[in-house]
């Protein structure tokens, strides 16, 4: 059995799990998420936790059981607590402003960048140079943060650009005469 799949997923109070064939849905205070479980993975709910096992013992199904366990754990955490990713804008004149489902960015281009947020994702701008991406789907929160960062990734000479709050930008020395 996969080492990851051996650990059960604990269900916190207020989180419901429903099975409909291969469809697994997790419902919590923040919303509902669904996952299609691979046919080779067996999911059992007992005593407030979910256990995962491979139906047969080959390598691929054991790996799939571990992957499914990790995805369901992220779903449970998402519907109960949610996920967030913080971005920082570094550079003269770099600004961000959230207006509903649109994030307006001034990133040193000759035009403003308007990023349409997908459904289920919210963005807050506590200051003009900080962006806070929130949502219940871990993959989608990370994807949105990566797409925003890709507009102007941090450059190694001056460090200007959009970076994750916990990112360390390796700096290079300027060319000497």
Curated annotation (Swiss-Prot):
Pfam families assigned: Ribosomal_L6 (PF00347)
Output the InterPro entries linked to this UniProt entry. Answer: Ribosomal_uL6-like, Ribosomal_uL6-like_a/b-dom_sf, Ribosomal_uL6_a/b-dom, Ribosomal_uL6_bac-type, Ribosomal_uL6_CS
Q: Which GO terms describe its biological process?
A: cytoplasmic translation
> Which keywords does UniProt give here?
Ribonucleoprotein, Ribosomal protein, RNA-binding, rRNA-binding
Extract the GO molecular function terms from the UniProt entry. rRNA binding; structural constituent of ribosome
Q: Does the entry feature the keyword Ribonucleoprotein, yes or no?
A: yes
Query: Could you give one GO CC term from the UniProt record?
Result: cytosolic large ribosomal subunit
Q: Please list which residues make up the signal peptide.
A: none
What is known about its subunit structure? Part of the 50S ribosomal subunit.
Concerning its family, UniProt says: Belongs to the universal ribosomal protein uL6 family.
Family matches, as HAMAP family = Ribosomal_uL6_B (MF_01365_B)
Q: Which NCBIfam families match?
A: L6_bact (TIGR03654)
In Swiss-Prot or TrEMBL terms, this protein is called Large ribosomal subunit protein uL6
What organism does this protein naturally occur in? Pseudomonas fluorescens (strain Pf0-1)
Q: Which gene encodes it?
A: rplF
């Amino acid at each position: 059995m996969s080492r990851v799949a051996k650990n059960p997923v604990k269900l916190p109070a207020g989180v419901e799990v429903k099975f409909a064939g291969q469809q697994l849905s997790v419902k919590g205070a923040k919303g509902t998420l669904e996952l299609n479980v691979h046919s080779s993975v067996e999911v059992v709910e007992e005593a407030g936790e979910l256990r995962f096992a491979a139906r047969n013992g080959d390598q691929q199904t054991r790996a799939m059981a571990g992957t499914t366990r990790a995805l369901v754990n992220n779903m449970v955490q998402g519907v109960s607590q949610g996920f967030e990713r913080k971005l920082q804008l570094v550079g003269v004149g770099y600004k961000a402003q959230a207006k509903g489902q649109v994030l307006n960015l001034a990133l040193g281009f000759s035009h403003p960048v308007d990023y349409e947020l997908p459904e289920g994702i919210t963005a807050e701008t506590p200051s003009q140079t900080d962006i806070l991406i929130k949502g219940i789907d871990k993959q989608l929160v990370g994807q949105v943060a990566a797409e925003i960062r890709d507009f102007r990734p941090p450059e190694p000479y001056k460090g200007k650009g959009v970076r994750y709050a916990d990112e360390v930008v390796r700096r290079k020395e300027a060319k000497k005469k």
